[in-house]
Amino acid sequence: MKFRIYITILALSIIGFQHLMGQGSKISGFISSEEGPARFVNISNLNSSFSTMTDTAGYYKLSNIPEGTYDLQITGVGFETLTKKVVVAKDASSILNFLLTKGNNTLNDVVVTGTLKAVRRTDSPVNVEVYTPSFFKKNPTPNIYEALQNVNGVRPQLNCNVCNTGDIHINGLEGPYTMVLLDGMPIVSALSTVYGLSGIPNALVERIEVVKGPASSLYGSEAVGGLINIITKDPNKAPMLSTDIFFTTSKEYNADVSFKVNAADKASILTGINYFNFQNIIDKNHDNFTDMTLQNRISLFQKWDIKRKNNRQFSLAGRYMYEDRWGGDLRYDSSFRGGDSIYGESIYTNRWELLGNYELPFTEKMMLSFSYNEHEQDSRYGKTSYIASQKIGFTQLTWDKNAGNHDLLFGIALRYTYYDDNTPTTQNADMLKNKNAPHITWLPGIFAQDEIALSKKHKILLGIRYDYNSYHGNILTPRFAYKWAIDPENMIRLNAGTGYRVVNLFREDHAALTGAREVIVANELNPERSYNVNLNYIRKFFIKDGTYLAFDLSTFYTYFNNRIVADLEQDPNKIIYDNLQGYALSKGINLNMDISFPFGLQIIAGGTWMENTLNQNGVRTQQLLTEKFTGTWAVSYTYPKSNISIDYTGNVYSPMRLPLLSSTDPRSPSSPWWSIQNIQLTYTGLKKVEFYFGIKNLLNWTPNKGNPFIIARAHDPFDKKVNYDANGQILATSENPYALSFDPTYIYGPNQGIRGFFGLRFKIL
């Protein structure tokens, strides 16, 4: 009897619930963007829990909505969030359509780096990673060099404890294997990569495109390990005024100001000014040397977009940078520059650049690109003087042609490099003449590329480049790529190619100029050759509750012939350069992950496992200063209705082999696991202003932890108290018990501890 009563009550409850639900209202409609239906977009109410998602055709439906006023929020990967206030009448049916605008997601960004053509990222057979300013704002930095620490597989590497020179590693390969472009032009190269990278302000950047693996078939020498293309802002899209100013509790000050002027209907002109100042002497490890290099830097940038008939392109850009930096003994000032009493490393840098693009007035799409830069460096490393001048000119003409299912690209290029310094490197071989002999390199090249659409899902790319180096002769670099778009959520890319590289000693190892080591070139250095294959798989998931997941998995393998190696271990007083009598390998796996939840949480994380080895005479050794694992993350959350967002960013590195001076050197032969972590709060409640503040290096990690010192014999940087035996080897004495000489190159991470920061951004559209 009781069972029947329960069944009756349950049935009546269900009928009553269905009746009540049937009294609600309905909202349905179509959501689209400029590219068509917006699939898998989430529609939710900020004031209650009901939500739904658009189908594959862009349609949605919300049922059983009580009468009332609601704030509907439409969110989707790749689109700006849209919020609309909706009034729902009792038992009504409403049709509401929405148009979404493109947001900061990078899945469908237009990229140019992979193929020298402007294509959607998803259409490119070459995997190009895209990073926008919104990504770098999660951990604000004064320049591009520092900003790249949050990119998986890319590591800014400091090479000197005193002057803080650095380069950029991609997949564990040293800086010389990374090509850095500015708007596709080889502006940052050779000498300028040592100090020029820190002079590129973030305010110039529209986006950064990263290609991992060789791209020599399109870009020539240096694009062996990968390339980084810094795309500057378009004057037509830039705000009228933009300002970003921040400072840290370490007394670092950075200011970015840009403004736009429209010259009638003829041109748009964007001007940017960046100033960075750090003059606070810090010595927390108590070695009487500066922990961080003091810097005073200004950079001026201007870009013109000139209007032409038929919307043909014509842009010009110029940049000037001046920097004065020094590090060393706490007692150092400019009066000791170049002397042997108080050690300091002082570098004055003057640099200017000009670059442009001009579309020729033909029916065929032909583009002339050109750039020129001069880099003047006046430096003292203790008593060692290094004064260098570099001039690089580049021009390239491309012809973009479509023929059926063939997307063709043909190009010719010419690169001129002038390099001169005050060392024997640029001295005439005839010592009796004692004449200066600058290095002048001519590098003409021609290339062709054919992207073939076999079907809607299958593409292949064939490319080949021929260069003639005035020192090394003929160089041929082929390329192959294949893309299989299984469906909109699954994609496979396969890339293979070759690369080549020539050497620049100062760029190869800054330790050559510390004054602590003698540079020895054992034999005539031949160009390196590399052979690479890269397999990439992208998988995207759109979950019904509005959650989005994307996984980007890549495996890479590179084989090197004639690998140029700087031997720091054979003799503590020398750097010995030679081609490896064997081969080198670089292999590993990259995984990038992007998760977006409908309630405002976003996670961007990645990890790279890699192995970089040198194989000579049957002996395999791990490359110095190269980790086997690196991980990065950025966790962001926006609090609803509060205009407050929080960003937690960081990276982690596995141990790496470090260069020691001898077997008695007490410093650790390898680094520990180490991590730099940061947190930031941003307030955007004001119309034109946003404030941000936070803490950098939450764990207060520095490389001196666990070591008795990181700079060997900082108290005797000129080695005046070092004794040698008859063979030139250092003797152990009571004053020098470990038999060491001055060595500032034991460094693998930034020597800057925990600090706070505060900043504001102001923008007028």
What are these regions (language model features)?
Residues 30-46, 75-79, 89, 93-137, ...:
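Short, acidic, small-residue-rich periplasmic hinge/interaction motif at the N-terminus
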Residues 63-64, 169, 185-212, 300, ...:
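Short acidic/polar hinge/loop motifs at secondary-structure boundaries
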Residues 95-98, 144-147, 166-169, 181, ...:
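N-terminal periplasmic accessory domains that precede
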Residues 145-186, 206:
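Extracytoplasmic beta-strand/coil segments of soluble accessory domains associated
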Residues 278-299, 305-366, 372-391:
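Flexible loop and strand-edge segments within Gram-negative outer membrane beta-barrel domains
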Residues 367-379, 485, 493, 526-579, ...:
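Membrane-embedded beta-barrel scaffold of Gram-negative outer-membrane proteins
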Residues 453-457, 551-559, 579-660:
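Gram-negative outer-membrane beta-barrel transporters
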Residues 652-659, 683-765:
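C-terminal beta-signal and adjacent terminal beta-strands/loops
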